[in-house]
């Protein structure tokens, strides 16, 4: 698998020893708290510090925030531009958690584009971890998410991405396709995920 499926330059590289803050803080953290955690790990051989869920939008619980990929300035004054150098000064790279395939119903993104979430017309949308799934079969959805994530990644020296997905696909129906083509959505969705991954991989 490593020789034939994993692409260069990752194929031969040694994986860094990393830690993240999730179990230590869940959604309740500040920049100073994260730096304190990183300092505590400094002498343990940790090479990469990953900031987990809760750094963006109104993400104080798992009921909100997904889809609004802008840094929460109350938690992280000065944004990633201010936080990342503080972590790097401890001799660690900086990694970032994202869950770009998902959206919260209370998010600005969902309020503006409710049709961008998968869901069968006339039926309540299925929720997992209080979130819906964005329709990555649609180009405009992918372009929006790609642009939002790239803006975040361009703001600081991000060495690693933790791409999460905390629920399964269900009620897979795209508002962009007629009923007789809904069987294509699963396949088109996966191709859409590959599209964003490929673009980000080429960028960075």
Where on the chain are the PLM-derived regions?
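A short alpha-helix capping/helix-coil boundary motif
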Residues: 14-18, 60-64, 127-130, 174-178
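Flexible hinge/switch segments at interdomain interfaces of large molecular machines
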Residues: 8-13, 57-58, 118-125
């Amino acid at each position: 698998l490593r020789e034939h499926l994993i692409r260069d330059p990752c194929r031969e590289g040694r994986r860094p020893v990393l830690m993240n803050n999730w179990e230590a803080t869940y959604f309740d953290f500040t920049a100073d708290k994260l730096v304190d955690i990183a300092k505590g790990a400094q002498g343990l051989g940790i090479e990469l510090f990953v900031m987990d869920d809760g750094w963006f939008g109104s993400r104080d619980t798992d009921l909100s925030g997904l889809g609004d990929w802008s840094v929460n300035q109350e938690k992280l004054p000065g944004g990633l531009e201010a936080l990342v150098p503080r972590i790097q000064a401890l001799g660690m790279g900086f990694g970032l958690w994202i869950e770009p395939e998902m959206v919260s119903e209370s998010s600005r993104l969902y309020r503006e584009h409710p049709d961008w979430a998968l869901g069968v017309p006339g039926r309540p949308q299925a929720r997992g971890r209080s979130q819906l799934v964005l329709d990555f079969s649609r180009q405009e959805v992918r372009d929006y998410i790609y642009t939002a994530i790239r803006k975040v990644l361009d703001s600081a020296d991000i060495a690693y991405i933790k791409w999460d997905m905390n629920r399964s696909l269900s009620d897979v129906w795209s508002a962009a396709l007629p009923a007789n083509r809904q069987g294509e959505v699963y396949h088109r969705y996966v191709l859409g995920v590959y599209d964003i991954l490929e673009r980000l991989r080429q960028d960075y």
